[in-house]
Design a protein with these regions (language model features):
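Generic alpha-helical structural context detector
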Residues: 7, 11, 31-34, 95, ...
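A short beta-sheet element
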Residues: 34-35, 49-113
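Active-site/binding-pocket entry motifs
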Residues: 38-39, 77, 118
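A short glycine-rich beta-alpha junction/loop motif
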Residues: 74-77, 88-95, 125-147
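Short amphipathic alpha-helical signal-transduction/dimerization elements
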Residues: 112-116, 120, 160
């Protein structure tokens, strides 16, 4: 295993926002995502809430990023992570990591998810904290061989699956306990009424 900088194994690109006062730039067919659309339950994002037009792309000189790109919110808030399921555009609240052949995007996804506090500590700015492209490029990651990355991701996926299953089971148990208590209350009220 070797330690490398993200900038050595990923191309890091930022997004841009087309002018919001140009209606011909909006409500098109192209995905344009913002950090507000990401949450902890999302691994792969396939659609954005807002869409832009081809005219917006041309006039604003927007750069798309391909499916498989790791999206990292770089401000407001720092540290939301997802993987693009298809080609997308985004606002400037992201630093997008286009993975080289040396790094598996889901391995990078899990790495970044585990480093939210660290990423926030790297934030700079008075009004709101932001991490720059240079900061992201210089983040170091332990990088095993790609085959090992796949194994690690497989194990992490299984752990997440088990946690999700246990959470569902706990929710059902909680509902059962609540319904049992409600049933007891109903029975005791009926006994009083009789």
């Amino acid at each position: 295993m070797m330690k490398v900088k993200l900038g050595d194994v990923c191309e890091i690109v930022s997004g841009t926002t087309p002018k919001s006062n140009c209606p011909e730039y909006w409500n098109g067919e192209l995905n344009w995502i913002t950090p507000a659309e990401l949450n902890d339950d999302i691994v792969v994002v396939n659609e954005s809430q807002r869409k832009i037009t081809t005219k917006a792309v041309i006039d604003s000189n927007l750069r798309s990023f391909p499916a498989g790109t790791v999206l990292l919110s770089s401000r407001a808030p720092i540290g939301k992570v997802a993987i693009a399921g298809k080609e997308m555009y985004c606002n400037q609240g992201f630093k997008n990591l286009i993975c080289s052949d040396f790094i598996y995007n889901k391995y990078l996804f899990y790495f970044l998810k585990s480093k939210v506090a660290y990423l926030n500590s790297l934030g700079r700015g008075a009004t709101f904290k932001e991490i720059s492209k240079t900061i992201v490029e210089n983040i170091q990651i332990n990088l095993p061989k790609k085959e090992e990355q796949y194994k690690i991701v497989y194990i992490l996926d299984k752990i997440i699956e088990i946690i999700s299953l246990r959470q569902q089971q706990l929710k059902k148990l909680d509902e059962l306990v609540k319904s049992r208590n409600v049933g007891e209350l109903v029975i005791s009220k009926m006994e009083v009424a009789v």
